[in-house]
A protein has these predicted regions:
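Glycine-rich, acidic loop regions that bind phosphate or pyrophosphate groups
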Residues: 1, 24, 80-190
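Glycine-rich phosphate/diphosphate-binding loops and the adjacent beta-loop-alpha structural elements
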Residues: 44-57, 67
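Conformationally flexible catalytic loops at phosphate/diphosphate-handling active centers
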Residues: 1-42, 193-199
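Short glycine-rich anion-binding loops that position phosphate/pyrophosphate groups of nucleotides
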Residues: 3-6, 52-54, 79-81, 118-121, ...
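A short helix->loop->beta-strand "cap" motif at the edges of active sites that frequently abuts
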Residues: 71-72, 133-137, 249
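Glycine-rich phosphate/diphosphate-binding loops that line cofactor/substrate pockets in enzymes
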Residues: 32-46, 66, 107-109, 217-224, ...
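A short, small-residue-rich loop immediately preceding and capping a beta-strand
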Residues: 49-52, 105-118, 253, 268-277
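Active-site diphosphate/adenylate-binding microenvironment
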Residues: 189-262, 270-272
């Protein structure tokens, strides 16, 4: 507190050994991957929810391989929309406050929810926190053990560990996809297409350009190596909702850091705060 007197003799001193122990990442038990696969096999409507931890652990390619192996839908967190391409047959949108209606219907209809590298904050699960995936058995994988203990999202199977390790372990296991899941995948595809952010009638409106139409047209012109940085407010939210990501594209909001690269970068913002230079 500002102006308070501090007695330094009562402060806890830094202990590098304690710091090292807290930073150690536990190994995921060998029986966990099979337990997850058993849950997937028995579920009627399994759904993977992928967050920023997938990118931070250099696991994007592993995630795509796993989805292809399991043949089940994958949704993405609001700030991880560039993990999975829009035209991927298993893409299930982004069920969040910044997401789309179809994807929200999907997460509410799944009976197994596997979250990978997402801390499931309020911006994701929204304010009716107990209703997010309310019909689902929840498996949560996070490198931060404290995230598994939050009262806002309570997993039935919390897994403290590196999502990269878990994905590698899952890929090594034998698994035959459940043929019944094909109907669920097609239903998810239908929901994504039925409830787009940019409705057909927006293209025929007379008057100022609809921002969703702009986003739609912009992504139609972008290629697989383009990088898009976004400002706050509508520039961020409406783009997250309407983005039709091609695999390899990057999309940032200015709550993170967008480093320069040798590829073309685009910036979309409004009158508010601008992204980092």
């Amino acid at each position: 507190v500002q102006g308070s007197q501090v007695d330094e003799t009562h402060l806890r001193h830094f202990d590098p050994q304690v710091d090292k122990a807290e930073a150690e990442i536990p190994q995921i038990p060998a029986d966990v991957p099979q337990a997850i696969l058993d849950k997937i096999k028995k579920a009627k409507a399994p759904l993977i929810f992928a967050g920023t931890g997938v990118r931070l652990s250099y696991s994007v390619k592993l995630l795509l391989r796993l989805v292809e192996k399991l043949k089940i839908p994958v949704a993405v967190a609001w700030n991880s929309g560039d993990l999975v391409a829009y035209d991927n047959p298993y893409y299930a949108g982004s069920p969040s406050r910044e997401g789309t209606r179809g994807s929200s219907f999907i997460v509410q209809s799944c009976d197994l929810l596997i979250t990978l590298g997402s801390r499931m904050n309020i911006r994701t699960i929204t304010y009716n926190k107990n209703d997010f995936g309310k019909n689902a058995y929840k498996i949560m994988v996070d490198i931060d053990e404290e995230e598994l203990k939050k009262p806002t999202f309570v997993p039935d199977m919390p897994i403290h560990g590196d999502v990269h390790q878990l994905l590698e372990m899952l890929l090594k296991e034998d698994y035959t996809p459940n043929a019944e899941h094909e109907k669920w995948v097609k239903w998810c595809q239908m929901m994504v297409n039925k409830y787009p952010a940019c409705l057909p009638e927006y293209h025929t409106q007379i008057g100022p350009l609809n921002p969703y139409v702009f986003v739609d047209a912009m992504f139609a012109q972008m290629n697989e190596r383009d990088v898009l940085t976004l400002g706050n407010g509508s520039a961020c939210v409406m783009t997250f909702q309407g983005a039709k990501i091609k695999q390899g594209q990057r999309m940032f909001t200015n709550s993170g850091c967008a480093a320069s690269s040798s590829w073309r970068c685009s910036c979309k913002t409004g009158k508010g705060p601008r992204p980092v230079h």
